[in-house]
Amino acid sequence: MRGCGLPMKMEHQVACGISLWKGFDFNLHFQGAGKSTFSIEGAVAYPFSQGYWGNIMTDVDGNYWSLGKNENPNAKYPRLSFGGNANNYRTSTYWMRDGSYLRLKNLEVGYTLPTKWINRIHLNKIRVYFMGTNLLTFSKFDLWDPEMGSTTGEKYPLSRTFTLGLTLNL
């Protein structure tokens, strides 16, 4: 990603772990970045860049400036063009986007069974838990995940995972 216009990217992380009532525990981890900008490129900024039969992103389709019968003066993107007429796609601050985000990176909720229950089966500890990764992202940028490190959006997003687990201590 190319930065422009802001003096420094601020990265932040917040983590919290709490042992709650009667064997329940809760851990969460937020991660994010502020004061981050980047210039979008690729198929969003240059539709048909792969040739006459090239693709355009869904967000561009029907949301570009046009004249005539289907005029769209309040479009999000400049007019579509192909070939040598690429003046619409010159580098400018128009293509700059806010890359700031806040993500709930990890969430874990667990329950440890009381020792009086597990002593009967000769174990020290039994804990059941649920863990989720990349559950929520808050960002003004909605075309793709701002943490991907891509100016084109042509990468797989981060996986959202869910885990159910059991911890046994002998």
Which residue ranges define each predicted feature?
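Hydrophobic, lipid-facing positions within transmembrane beta-strands of outer-membrane proteins
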Residues: 10-16, 104-107, 160-164
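Repeated loop/turn-to-beta-strand initiation elements of outer-membrane beta-barrel proteins
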Residues: 23-26, 116-117
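Membrane-embedded beta-strand positions of outer-membrane beta-barrel proteins
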Residues: 16, 28, 128-130, 166
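Transmembrane beta-barrel domains of outer membrane proteins
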Residues: 17-19, 110-114, 167-169
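C-terminal beta-signal and terminal closure region of outer-membrane beta-barrel proteins
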Residues: 62, 66-72, 87-92, 135-170
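Extracytoplasmic gating/loop element in the C-terminal half of outer-membrane beta-barrel translocons
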Residues: 33-127
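Short sequence motifs at beta-strands and strand-loop junctions characteristic
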Residues: 4-9, 94-103, 156-158
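Transmembrane beta-strands of outer-membrane beta-barrel pores
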Residues: 30-36, 106, 113, 132-139, ...
